[in-house]
Amino acid sequence: MIQQVKPSLDPPANGGANASIDASPLLSVRNIEVVYDEVILVLRGLSLDVPRGAVVALLGANGAGKSTTLKAISGLLKTENGEVTRGEIVFDGERIDGGDPVRTVRRGISQVMEGRRIIADLTALENLRLGAFTRRDKEVARDIEMVFAYFPRLKER
């Protein structure tokens, strides 16, 4: 079960960490239903709003629907024969459910898989090369260029 956790204290009236959060949602998931293999209902009636500037975490037990929710938002359900069959997902005023995952990533939405740790003492480039040790150098160089094109700040790390 996924539930939205609301803070127990109101943000400070004089500004503070939450002062820059805009009240209008940047991401809105509205009453979605997700089905796998056309018959397995995984999520039903899930709704949540993510305000601009907010940091949100989905917490729950194994099988609660966290990964499925993130796959629905990032457009990756099709890779596992899943689909949003009801409701809608809106990002910055535009519907994105059922859309192209590449376009979704270009909007700045992506899923970070759990349990994938980088080696902190290595640069981003060294971590990328480490994960590609079985591939040819030309392929790796091309793919690393593409990663840096999508995420230019990684070059700095």
Predicted region positions:
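ABC-type ATPase nucleotide-binding domains, specifically the catalytic core motifs of the NBD
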Residues: 37-38, 56, 77-80, 124-142, ...
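Short coil-to-beta microelement around the adenine-binding A-loop and adjacent beta1/P-loop entry
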Residues: 39-41, 103
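Short beta-strand immediately N-terminal to the Walker A/P-loop
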Residues: 56-57, 111
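The feature captures the beta-strand-to-loop junction immediately N-terminal to the Walker
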Residues: 59-64
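Helix-to-loop junction immediately C-terminal to a conserved catalytic motif
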Residues: 74
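Conserved ABC transporter NBD signature motif
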Residues: 84-94, 107, 140-146
